[in-house]
C-alpha cells in the first residue's frame, strides 16, 4: 500500500488569496487538508491603544480604517457608543441618513465580496470588475455627501457632518432603478455556472451548532440557517420602522453564504426605498445643534452594536470623565468569523481553502486592528 506523509505548508502572509497579510499554516496529506492554523497579527496597528490617547472625536476617522470597505458602518457603531455614553440625542432626519449610508455600504460590500469570490476561483479580473461596477456608483454617492470615497469620516455625535446635497437623491434614484437587473445578473453568475457550482456547493460547510459555538455573525451565521440579525434582534436607530426579510441558507456551505449576500443586497434596496419615502424634510436636521463634539462623558461605560455588512460590529467604551476614553474595545466581526476557519477547511482540498476564506469575507485591518 502506498504510504503518504503529512506536510506543513504556509499560505501567506504575502499571498494574493489571503485578502491581506494573513498566514495559514496548513497540514496536508497529498491535496487534502488535515489541519489549519490561522496566524494573525501582521497588520496590527495598535488601534485600541491609540484610541485611548485620542479625544472621542479624533477617533472617528480611525474607525474608517478598521474595515475600509465599510467606513460608514464603522462610524455608525462608534457614534452610537459615544452617544449612549454622553446622552446625546440624534435628530430623526439624521437617523434616516445614517441608515441610508449603511445600507448603501452593505450593497457595496456584498457586490465586492461576490466579485472577489469568483476571482478566487480562478476567473481572473473580469468578474471582479463586474462586481465592482455598481460599487463605483455608490462610491460616487459617498463622495457627493462626504467628500471622500472610501474613508468617509461622515458621522458625528448627534448626526452626520453635513446634509445630503441636492444632487444626491436624484442620483440615488437612478442607482435604485439599475440595481435589480444588476443583482439578478450577479445571481445568474452564481446559479448558472457549472464550474462555480462545483467549487461552491458542499464546500466549507459550517453546521449551525458549530457556527453558534464560535459566535460568528452576519452572512456567515445566516448562511448556516440561523436568522439572526441585530437590526431585527435588537433594533437600533430607525430600523424598527422598515419592512425587510432576513435571508438564510440551508447547509452552511460557500454557495449558501454568497446566496445570502445576494439576497441581502435586495433587502438593502428595499430599506433604502423606504428611507426615501419616510425621510423627514427638516432643514438642519442632519445633526443635533446642541451636541458637543469635544465631549466629556460622565463616568460610566456603554456598548453599542450594529449589523455591519460582515456581521455584528460593537464598540465598548469606558469613560473616566475626561475627554479621552479610559477603555476602548472593538468587537470586530471579521476576527470572530475567522475563528472556525480550521473546522471549515478540514477534509477539503488545498484549492478549496482560498474559496472558503473568501466566503467568510474578511478585511485584515479589522481582524488585526
UniProtKB/Swiss-Prot annotation:
It catalyses: a quinone + NADH + 5 H(+)(in) = a quinol + NAD(+) + 4 H(+)(out). It is a peripheral membrane protein. It comes from Chloroflexus aurantiacus (strain ATCC 29366 / DSM 635 / J-10-fl). This is NADH-quinone oxidoreductase subunit D 1. Its main location: membrane. Belongs to the complex I 49 kDa subunit family. Transmembrane segments: none annotated. One of its GO terms (cellular component) is plasma membrane. It is an enzyme of class 7 (translocase). It is found in: Cell membrane. The lineage of its organism: Bacteria, Bacillati, Chloroflexota, Chloroflexia, Chloroflexales. Disulfide bonds: none annotated. NDH-1 shuttles electrons from NADH, via FMN and iron-sulfur (Fe-S) centers, to quinones in the respiratory chain. The immediate electron acceptor for the enzyme in this species is believed to be ubiquinone. Couples the redox reaction to proton translocation (for every two electrons transferred, four hydrogen ions are translocated across the cytoplasmic membrane), and thus conserves the redox energy in a proton gradient. NCBIfam families: PRK06075.1 (NF004739). It comes from the Bacteria.
Amino acid at each position: 500500500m502506498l504510504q503518504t506523509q503529512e506536510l506543513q505548508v504556509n499560505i501567506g502572509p504575502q499571498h494574493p488569496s489571503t485578502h491581506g497579510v494573513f498566514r495559514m499554516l496548513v497540514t496536508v496529506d497529498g491535496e487534502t487538508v488535515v489541519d489549519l492554523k490561522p496566524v494573525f497579527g501582521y497588520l496590527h496597528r495598535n488601534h485600541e491603544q491609540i484610541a485611548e490617547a485620542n479625544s472621542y472625536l479624533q477617533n472617528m476617522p480611525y474607525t474608517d480604517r478598521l474595515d475600509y470597505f465599510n467606513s460608514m458602518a464603522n462610524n455608525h457603531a462608534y457614534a452610537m457608543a459615544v452617544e449612549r455614553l454622553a446622552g446625546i440625542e440624534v435628530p430623526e432626519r439624521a437617523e434616516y441618513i445614517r441608515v441610508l449610508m449603511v445600507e448603501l455600504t452593505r450593497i457595496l460590500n456584498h457586490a465586492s465580496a461576490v466579485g472577489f469570490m469568483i476571482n478566487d476561483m480562478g476567473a481572473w479580473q473580469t468578474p471582479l470588475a463586474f462586481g465592482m461596477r455598481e460599487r463605483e456608483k455608490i462610491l460616487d454617492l459617498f463622495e457627493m455627501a462626504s467628500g471622500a470615497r472610501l474613508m468617509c469620516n461622515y458621522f458625528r455625535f448627534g448626526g452626520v457632518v453635513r446634509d445630503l446635497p441636492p444632487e444626491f437623491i436624484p442620483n440615488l434614484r437612478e442607482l435604485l432603478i439599475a440595481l435589480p437587473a444588476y443583482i439578478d445578473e450577479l445571481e445568474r453568475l452564481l446559479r448558472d455556472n457549472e464550474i462555480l457550482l462545483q467549487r461552491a456547493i458542499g464546500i466549507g460547510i459550517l453546521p449551525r451548532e458549530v457556527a453558534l459555538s464560535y459566535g460568528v455573525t452576519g452572512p456567515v451565521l445566516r448562511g448556516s440557517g440561523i436568522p439572526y440579525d441585530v437590526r431585527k434582534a435588537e433594533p437600533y436607530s430607525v430600523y424598527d420602522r422598515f419592512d425587510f426579510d432576513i435571508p438564510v441558507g440551508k447547509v452552511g456551505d460557500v454557495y449558501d453564504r454568497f446566496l445570502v449576500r445576494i439576497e441581502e443586497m435586495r433587502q438593502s434596496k428595499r430599506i433604502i426605498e423606504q428611507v426615501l419615502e419616510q425621510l423627514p424634510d427638516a432643514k438642519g436636521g442632519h445633526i443635533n445643534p446642541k451636541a458637543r463634539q469635544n465631549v466629556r462623558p460622565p463616568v460610566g461605560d456603554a456598548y453599542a452594536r450594529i449589523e455591519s455588512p460582515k456581521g455584528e460590529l460593537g464598540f465598548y467604551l469606558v469613560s473616566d470623565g475626561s475627554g479621552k476614553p479610559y477603555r476602548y474595545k472593538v468587537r470586530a466581526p471579521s476576527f470572530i468569523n475567522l475563528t472556525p476557519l480550521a473546522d471549515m477547511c478540514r477534509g477539503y482540498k488545498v484549492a478549496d481553502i482560498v474559496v472558503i476564506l473568501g466566503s467568510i469575507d474578511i478585511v485584515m485591518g479589522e481582524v488585526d486592528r
